Swiss-Prot record:
Protein family per UniProt: Belongs to the cytochrome c oxidase subunit 2 family.
Residue ranges, Mitochondrial intermembrane side: 1-14, 88-230
Entry's localization field: Mitochondrion inner membrane
Mitochondrial matrix side: 46-59
Oligomeric and partner information: Component of the cytochrome c oxidase (complex IV, CIV), a multisubunit enzyme composed of 14 subunits. The complex is composed of a catalytic core of 3 subunits MT-CO1, MT-CO2 and MT-CO3, encoded in the mitochondrial DNA, and 11 supernumerary subunits COX4I, COX5A, COX5B, COX6A, COX6B, COX6C, COX7A, COX7B, COX7C, COX8 and NDUFA4, which are encoded in the nuclear genome.
NCBIfam families per the UniProt record, alphabetical: CoxB
Coiled-coil positions: none
Keyword Transmembrane helix on entry: yes
PANTHER family in the cross-refs: CYTOCHROME C OXIDASE SUBUNIT 2 (PTHR22888:SF9), CYTOCHROME C OXIDASE, SUBUNIT II (PTHR22888)
InterPro entries from the UniProt entry: CcO_II, CcO_II-like_C, CcO_II_C, Copper_CuA, Cupredoxin, Cyt_c_oxidase_su2, Cyt_c_oxidase_su2_TM_dom, Cyt_c_oxidase_su2_TM_sf
Name of this protein: Cytochrome c oxidase subunit 2
Organism name: Ornithorhynchus anatinus (Duckbill platypus)
Keyword presence, Magnesium: yes
């Protein structure tokens, strides 16, 4: 999760987020080199006497500043396209979760189980326990197993919402009448927090998401207990 005064990204919890962090560093390095070159050229022009002010043709220079930007764009585009392909690729998911956005809460349905679904509401500030996070805690966590590919089917019952988990590198719009899908694969257990990331009304900021990733054994015990109490 995020911390006060944090400047960087949250710790990666999924292979996709790890790839996004590498891509961010890769792109930032290219931008830094370009910025350094531009600043060097500007400082040189300001501190030295201009020469060749009457040059009408410079074929070599024009060739360089046409080809070099194209190469730079390719170096940025190739890893970006690779990550986009990875985010859209869903191969043999072990579990399918249907997520529906409402004003202003989330509902989850475990499609592989006969009758396992629930709503997830934010816990009001006055009901929080010591150590719980304001505007981020919910009454029912979305519990999923770690190290397994999970397909998320995301839609909305009313207006536009967006189901976002920064540590997973995941942000998928929930659109009425349309079913979007995403993949979750967690590399470690824990609690991971997100929020609705599309303005959806007066209580938009009160739609937190809490994902609880647990080992498969604990997940099976949890599903059994949930189905026995429903």
């Amino acid at each position: 999760m995020a911390y006060p005064l944090q400047l960087g990204f949250q710790d990666a919890t999924s292979p996709i987020m790890e790839e996004l962090l590498h891509f961010h560093d890769h792109t930032l390095m290219i931008v830094f080199l370009i910025s350094s070159l531009v600043l060097y050229i500007i400082s040189t022009m300001l501190t030295t006497k201009l020469t060749h002010t009457n040059t009408m043709d410079a074929q070599e220079v024009e060739t360089i500043w046409t080809i070099l930007p194209a190469i730079i764009l390719i170096l940025i585009a190739l890893p970006s396209l690779r990550i986009l392909y990875m985010m859209d690729e869903i191969n043999n998911p072990n579990l399918t979760i249907k997520t529906l956005g409402h004003q202003w809460y989330w509902s989850y349905e475990y499609s592989d189980y006969e009758d396992l679904s629930f709503d997830s509401y934010m816990i009001p500030t006055q009901d929080l326990l010591p150590g719980q996070l304001r505007l981020l805690e919910v009454d029912n966590h979305l519990v999923l197993p770690i190290e397994l590919p999970i397909r998320m089917l995301i839609s909305s019952e009313d207006v536009l919402h967006s189901w976002a988990l920064p540590s997973m590198g995941l942000k998928t719009d929930a659109i009425p009448g349309r079913l979007n899908q995403a993949t979750i694969t967690s590399t470690r257990p824990g609690l991971f927090y997100g929020q609705c990331s599309e303005i959806c009304g007066s209580n938009h900021s009160f739609m937190p998401i809490v994902l609880e990733m647990v080992p498969l054994k604990y997940f099976e015990n949890w599903t059994s207990s949930m189905m026995s109490t429903s």
